[in-house]
Amino acid sequence: ITDATTNQLLAMAHRRLGPPPVPYAWVAAGSQGRLEQTAKTDQDNCLILDDSFEEATHGAYFKALSTFVCDGLNACGYVYCPGNMMAVNPQWRVTLSQWQNYFERWITQPDPNALMLTCVFFDLRFIGGTASLFQSLQEEVFPLAQKNGIFLSHMVANALTHRPALNWWGGLSWNQAKRHPKSINLKHNAIVPIVDLARVYALAEGI
């Protein structure tokens, strides 16, 4: 449903703004990228622009397109990302070469912020536009991650910080927060550890 909604919004934006001046790929990240969105979810997305993009000439078009689609998703119930990881943010609306530079830096300099970003942007999935831009990014990034053992070890260490809701005796470890006592956060204590593990194994295999 989210993919169909996004593509309809892209088509509406094209009718309003005209055809895109350079090729682009609209890409979903996070839970939408992994096809695991729940009923209550925010939006994570980005734009990969062709390297022929020039900010002075084409910037206004893609800013307007991103704003239209992100606003439309919010109106449909896919609320704005609290971390601003959306195509409407100029940081995540850049050329293919800039995306390749982002990933190269995150992989070769895996500080805590880089690891946080990779947990979002390694889970990308093409939604609309020119698919070859997305494929080119994957072909560049996956081999780079696969052969960097230091990066993968940092990803493993980061994954181990997200623990399942189990105590030392194998029983359930309940949430002790006053607002929701005797509860379990299924996202952070069940889904995230599995996703983190799957991501590490996938990157190690170049998938």
Residues of each region from the PLM?
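Conserved nucleotidyltransferase catalytic core and NTase-mimicking acidic/glycine-rich helix/loop elements
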Residues: 22-23, 129-207
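N-terminal intrinsically disordered, cationic/polar leader segments
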Residues: 119-129
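Generic structural "secondary-structure junction" signal
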Residues: 41, 105, 123-124, 171-174, ...
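Active-site nucleotide-donor binding segment shared across nucleotidyl transfer reactions
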Residues: 2-58
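Secondary-structure capping and boundary motifs in well-ordered enzyme cores
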Residues: 28, 32-39, 61, 65, ...
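Feature representing long, continuous alpha-helical segments
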Residues: 47, 67, 71, 192-195, ...
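Conserved catalytic core of two-metal-ion nucleotidyltransferases
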Residues: 1-8, 16-23, 56-119, 132-140
